Amino acid sequence: MIYFSDKELDDLLLEDIYRGDLTTHALSIENIPAKILFKRKNAGVVAGVSVAEKLLKKLDIQPHLYVKEGEWVESGALLISAEGMSEQLHQAWKVVQLVLEWSCGVAQYTAEMIANAKSVNPTAVVACTRKSIPNTRKLATNAVLAAGGHIHRQGVSETLLVFTNHRNLLSDPNDWTKIVDRLRQEAPENKITLEADNYAQFEQMYMAEPDIIQLDKWLLEDVKKALDLLQSKQKDILLSVAGGVNKNNVSDYAKLGIRLFITSAPYYVPPEDIKVVIEKI
């Protein structure tokens, strides 16, 4: 489970309720005991319930959870219920709903992409990038993990990944062996990934024997050529594909023999529909 600090939870709440609920106050219904229900409209994967629970508790509402992160539910399934005064419930309503809707959307797409990849290659791994919508990375990470996905990397300090923009600043940007040797010396605990923009680059860099070569925005036929070359040279280098990889084409790459898929696609899908009902006790 991803840890969310009090500040992060407060920031989510204060974006919507920084001056209270004017409508509830104007109708003088703040102190009416009530209950709130959150239901998933369509069948699918659930994510965000752990964050939703914390948000409700921040408003002194004690929630009841009926599902766990990553659980598959039927349409209309009750995810969370809670009881409290109308004022608190109305303040919680939209923030919790949005967290659930967006998280479930990310998780649903991730789960479908994983299923498509594993239908061809049971060892396939779908890893999501750091290219999330700004200020949503932790929510996105929580949703991806709930769906059974992996994280490519959370930030630039986590892995060694050499892009062309790094090499542009080197005195000899095409000395792949020197680049790999330097990285092995400076960060011996980390695997080394080089990104190949095209097949011509790949033909040069594979001889330096990095741990992983990431193929960015490659056509299927070029990916196959790269795989065939490594096999013919008996090089034990893992290939990953990135750039435009989504649930609709992941199986095409898997059929070639790729097992590591780098994607940002889950972050930009429509949210799932979470129905919310508030009613008197």
Curated annotation (Swiss-Prot):
Entry EC number(s): 2.4.2.-
Keywords associated with the record: Glycosyltransferase, Transferase
Gene Ontology molecular function terms on file: nicotinate-nucleotide diphosphorylase (carboxylating) activity
SUPFAM superfamilies, per database record: Nicotinate/Quinolinate PRTase C-terminal domain-like, Nicotinate/Quinolinate PRTase N-terminal domain-like
Gene giving rise to this polypeptide: modD
Regions crossing the membrane: none
Family designation: Belongs to the NadC/ModD family.
Claim: Chloroplast is one of the keywords in the record: no
Gene Ontology biological process terms from the UniProt entry: NAD biosynthetic process; quinolinate catabolic process
Protein name per its UniProtKB record: Putative pyrophosphorylase ModD
Domain of life: Bacteria
Pfam families cross-referenced by the UniProt entry: QRPTase_C, QRPTase_N
One Gene Ontology cellular component: cytoplasm
InterPro entries: Aldolase_TIM, ModD, NadC/ModD, Nicotinate_pribotase-like_C, Quinolinate_PRibosylTase_N_sf, Quinolinate_PRibosylTrfase_C, Quinolinate_PRibosylTrfase_N
